[in-house]
Regions:
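Fe-S ferredoxin-like electron-transfer domains
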Residues: 48-173
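N-terminal cofactor/phosphate-binding cores enriched in small/glycine residues
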Residues: 5, 10-74, 84-88
Length: 173
C-alpha cells in the first residue's frame, strides 16, 4: 500500500520515516525555513519558520507544528499557506527581527539574504523597524579563520553544523 498525505489539497506519496519538510521538498512544495540545511541533514527546529497546520485522519481541528521535526503520517492533511500558519510565521519572524541588527546595508548578505527572502514570502515585505535595537554585541575577529558578528546571528545553528560536519573541527558551539 502506498503512503500518501495531502499538501494544500495535492496528494503526495512518501516513505516511512520522513518528515513533513522532507516530503514537501521532494514534491517541490516550498515551506520556508532558516535552520534546516538538507545537505547536512540539519533540522533542529530552532528557527520555527517551517510551521504548517496538520490534520490527522478524523481531526476536525488542526495543530500547528514544525515541518522539519514532525514525522509525516498516512492520510494527513497539511496546510502550508493558510491564514493561521502565516500569522504564526509572521509572529516568529518578528521575534527573530527583535534581536537582529537590521542595518541590512552593512551586511555582506544584503541583496542575497534568506532572512529577507523568507520575510517577503510570508507577507512581511517591510521588516518591522526596531530602531531601539541597541544590543551591539562585540564583533569577534580574534581568529583569522572565523569572524563572527553575533548581531546578525539568528541562532539557526547552520554555522555550528558546517564547522562540525563539513570542516570536521567542531570549534563552534
Amino acid at each position: 500500500m502506498e503512503n500518501f498525505a495531502w499538501f494544500n489539497g495535492q496528494k503526495v506519496a512518501f516513505t516511512d520515516g520522513q518528515t513533513i519538510l522532507q516530503v514537501a521538498k521532494q514534491a517541490d512544495i516550498f515551506i520556508p525555513t532558516l535552520c534546516a540545511f538538507m545537505p547536512l541533514n540539519h533540522t533542529p527546529g530552532t528557527c520555527r519558520m517551517c510551521l504548517v497546520e496538520v490534520f490527522d485522519e478524523g481531526d476536525e481541528v488542526g495543530r500547528v507544528v514544525t515541518a522539519c521535526t514532525t514525522p509525516i503520517k498516512q492520510g494527513q492533511r497539511i496546510f502550508t499557506r493558510n491564514e493561521r500558519v502565516r500569522k504564526m510565521q509572521q509572529l516568529q519572524m518578528q521575534l527573530l527581527f527583535a534581536d537582529h541588527d537590521q542595518d541590512c546595508k552593512s551586511c555582506s548578505r544584503h541583496g542575497n539574504c534568506e532572512l529577507q527572502d523568507v520575510a517577503l514570502f510570508i507577507g512581511m515585505p517591510n521588516t518591522p523597524n526596531h530602531s531601539n535595537y541597541i544590543a551591539k554585541r562585540p564583533y569577534d575577529d580574534s581568529s583569522m579563520g572565523i569572524i563572527r558578528d553575533v548581531n546578525k546571528c539568528i541562532r539557526c545553528g547552520r554555522c555550528v553544523e558546517v564547522c562540525r560536519q563539513v570542516q570536521g573541527i567542531g570549534a563552534l558551539t
